[in-house]
């Protein structure tokens, strides 16, 4: 089983936090060469704090994917970090969350023989399921153009709120990710098409997914240097 669950910052064990921040350093600094802060072979920043919740995808005790959620009423990267890259950048009032630091560790995926499973679709679904479980109205994130295409190909009906230009003069986007039942069903249908097993509780949170062989993930995140949920820290 691949298990998806959430932990808040204060609930992270020392072992789990070291594993998470080490994987983030490998992804965002070593692989993508983002302008991020690293110490002791780990990547973390001021947004890793008591207001933060992490989504984990875990298989056989190892983290294979993760992302970070912060309620938009608290300081977040959209307003504090990325505002200079947009002519206008405003988040609507309401019960929303910001997503950042999303990654899928492809080395672990290969080592655990999971590359034939729709990991990225499951991670996207876990975002919806988590948000729905707590009554959030939607998710916002800053993404690159290639990442926007990945979301669109997944079937998730994300929308562009604002368009900006990064410090590398590349297009970046503030997007809204709906968490309604319709979009949840779209992703579940897509997952079932690729892995037609008896996964009857895909709308649940926490989320567990029964794995099998000979299924491909066409929407696996490709670790090219274009960034995922952002372009880097200032």
Q: Which residue ranges define each predicted feature?
A:
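Short connector loops at helix/strand junctions that flank enzyme active sites
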Residues: 50-52, 64, 92-97
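Short, His- and charge-rich active-site/binding loops that engage polyanionic ligands
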Residues: 58-90
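Charge-rich, low-complexity intrinsically disordered segments
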Residues: 101, 169-234
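Residues in well-ordered beta-strands of folded domains
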Residues: 3-5, 56, 70, 100, ...
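Short, solvent-exposed loop/turn elements at beta->coil junctions and helix N-caps
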Residues: 39-46, 162-165
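Short amphipathic alpha-helix that is part of the acyltransferase structural core
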Residues: 1-43, 54-56, 63
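A short helix-loop-beta-strand connector motif used in the catalytic cores of GNAT acetyltransferases and
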Residues: 46-55, 74
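Acyl-donor binding region in acyl/amide transferases
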Residues: 82-172, 176-177, 181
